[in-house]
A protein has these predicted regions:
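Membrane-embedded helix bundles of polyisoprenyl
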Residues: 14, 104-116, 121-207, 218-236, ...
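Transmembrane helical bundles and short interhelical boundary loops of multi-pass, membrane-embedded
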Residues: 32, 336-344, 378, 382, ...
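Membrane-interface coil-to-helix junctions
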Residues: 17-109, 130-153, 253-287, 334-342
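Periplasmic/ER-lumenal interhelical loops and adjacent helix-loop junctions
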Residues: 41-51, 55-57, 225-307, 426-469, ...
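Hydrophobic alpha-helical membrane-interfacial segments at the cytosolic entry of transmembrane helices
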Residues: 6-15, 211-237, 249-252, 319-327, ...
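Start-transfer (signal-anchor) and selected internal transmembrane alpha helices
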Residues: 1-23, 217, 222, 309-310, ...
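Hydrophobic, aromatic-rich transmembrane alpha-helices
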Residues: 227, 294-330, 570-577
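Active-site-proximal, structured, solvent-exposed surfaces of multi-pass membrane proteins
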Residues: 475-578
């Protein structure tokens, strides 16, 4: 157990290492990034813009002519970015958020290696934490702007709680479930399958060692965590599985990694400069496959797994980690055969929406580091003397520098787009729907211009979003129009609610909202239906109607999710106090 001074030193060390690794972000601290950075910053900006109107982040009228926000799996509803953006530009807030996630990942991995597994050497523990946190897979996704994968850094904390739960701590089970809920609420719906697979392979690995309790605890932690996060999960599932969605994600199969791709992924650090391997085999760019660990880390993980399975089966946790590493590698290898794990998982309802199996490579350094830690602990217990330990510690220090320097190069020259106008982030003006996004000056790099368009008050129909509702909105202001003998006046706007005063003549009329249609729209004047001519949200107004008509959006499944979450939290409080 570390004393307070040693704890401060360890935390300080990880802050320094994380800051050094993320330093390319801060070369231009206020600049935005290329690639998908713009659209993912836009998700956060849309939540803040809704808050400026006093609305919860239910609907995003600045996107594609109107799109779901709360039900969008990629949107975060809980994040430090929102508080930081109150005192600094959102681009800088996001960079500090990324840095914070790296530090949290290091500390979580350190706890697993030192307190759960029992590695004594600080140098070895720091290297194993670095092997996970500074690995190539998450770095390449951060480079691309895929902030939805940042919650991966919370997985070691969940695993830490899982190991404590297997030792008999009920409170650790509840804490692990709460961490899983935070992962989801923090925009980590894409990380939820990782969490399920991670706990699943550890549980199955324990089953291979003759213990069923860890598998049952893994299931309990997943179910309870999903119950906590049900207010986010239920609307997202209903949206993705519903009939309103226009899913533009390409389906490429079979998606698998050849032997050459696996070698390059784990042992070659030049992935961003490489062309695709074997045209027709590598279906995506290297950001979906790369995961540089270095020869030292990669070989050490595989050798440790082999040694544990052959000679170190006394500790069931070590066996679980070794079996888990083999299983994660098999899943990440993709659909290489009809019976491959990824091929089977694609047929399952939950996993079928997760279309790139190579992304499970992000779990390889986590499970691999645990496997090495179990082998290192056994080695520490088996041999005396200090000379060999000093040599290994020096090698670990060199390995930390090597993996950090090699993978940090992927983060260079990404944040080169001029800073946004922060003062416009909290403007309370209704958007105008336009055919195309606003193109702002800047470097000729891949950009989506979604954030720039929102700041300019534009909701572009030609938008960058794989999960969107079917487009029926038309260019023009976001407002209610009347069809038939209907007179409208005194229009008001907020993201979730558009209202106007309506007066209807002798014949029935119709009020139509210029937004895309989605389940969740309601009105104060009756049931909302698709307008027969435009497909937009509309309501039939009876003859002689006079009063305010308001279209309001609330994501379907929200209140069911809230009820499930309250019940789960209530049950957890009872269990916690026992």
């Amino acid at each position: 157990m570390l004393n307070r001074r040693e704890t401060y030193l360890v935390v300080g060390l990880y802050v320094v290492l994380s800051a050094a690794f993320c330093w390319p972000f801060f070369a231009q601290p206020l600049a935005s990034g290329s690639g998908d950075w713009d659209v993912h910053l836009f998700y956060y900006a849309a939540v803040l813009r809704n808050a400026a109107f006093g609305d919860l982040p239910f609907w995003n009228p600045w996107y594609c002519g109107g799109n779901v926000l709360w039900a969008n799996p990629q949107a975060s509803v809980v994040s430090p970015v929102y508080l930081l953006s109150l005192v600094m530009p959102i681009a800088l807030a996001m960079k500090l958020n990324v840095l914070g996630h790296y530090v949290i990942g290091c500390l979580g991995m350190h706890l697993v290696v030192r307190r759960v597994i029992g590695v004594q050497s600080t140098a070895v523990a720091v290297y194993l934490a670095s092997l996970f946190v500074f690995a190539g897979a998450i770095t390449l996704h951060v480079r691309s702007g895929h902030t939805v994968f940042l919650p991966v850094f919370l997985l070691p904390w969940m695993v830490y709680c899982f190991w404590l739960a297997t030792a008999g701590s009920t409170r650790a089970l509840l804490c692990g479930s709460a961490i899983l809920a935070v992962i989801v609420l923090n925009g980590g719906m894409h990380v939820l399958p990782f969490a399920v697979v991670l706990l699943g392979v550890l549980g199955l690995g324990a089953l291979a060692a003759g213990r069923i309790k860890p598998l049952l605890l893994a299931v309990a932690m997943i179910v309870l965590g999903c119950a906590y996060a049900a207010p986010k999960i239920a609307p997202a599932v209903l949206f993705v599985r519903g009939g309103d969605i226009n899913d533009t994600r390409p389906v490429k199969d079979p998606d698998y990694m050849s032997t050459e791709m696996l070698r390059i992924s784990l042992f070659d650090g030049s992935q961003t400069t490489r062309v695709k391997v074997s045209p027709g085999v590598q279906l995506y760019g290297w950001h979906e496959y790369g995961n540089y660990l270095g020869w030292f880390g990669g070989v050490l993980a595989l050798a440790s797994a082999g040694w544990i399975l052959a000679f170190g089966r006394d500790d069931w946790r070590a066996v679980a980690a070794a079996v888990g590493l083999v299983m994660v590698l098999a899943i990440a290898a993709g659909e290489f055969a009809a019976f491959a794990p990824a091929s089977v998982m694609r047929q399952l309802p939950f996993f079928s929406s997760f279309r790139v199996p190579s992304r499970y490579m992000m779990l390889v350094p986590l499970v691999g580091a645990m496997t090495v830690a179990f082998a290192a602990r056994a080695l520490e217990a088996a041999r005396g003397g200090s000379a060999w330990r000093r040599a290994i510690e020096v090698l670990c220090v060199v390995a930390v520098c090597e993996i950090g320097l090699v993978n940090r190069q992927h983060l260079r020259e990404i944040f080169i787009v001029p800073a946004d106008t922060q003062s416009r982030l909290f403007e309370r003006t209704p958007p105008v729907i336009a055919p195309h996004p606003v193109v702002t000056p800047g470097p000729r790099v891949h950009r989506t211009f979604m954030l720039d368009s929102m700041l300019a008050g534009i909701s572009p129909l030609n938008c960058y979003e794989p999960l969107q509702v079917k487009k029926v909105a038309v260019p023009g202001p976001v407002e209610i129009r009347g069809e038939g003998d209907v007179t409208l006046s005194a229009s008001t706007f907020s993201p979730n609610r558009v209202a106007a005063t309506a007066v209807v003549g002798r014949d029935p009329g119709r009020a139509v909202l210029n937004q895309n249609f989605a389940q969740g729209w309601s009105s104060s004047a009756g049931a909302v239906e698709r307008d027969p001519s435009s497909g937009q949200p509309s309501v039939v107004l009876p003859a002689g109607y006079s009063g305010t008509i308001a279209f309001t959006f609330v994501p379907p499944g929200l209140w069911i999710g809230v009820a499930v979450s309250i019940a789960a939290i209530g049950l957890s409080i009872v269990v916690w106090r026992r």
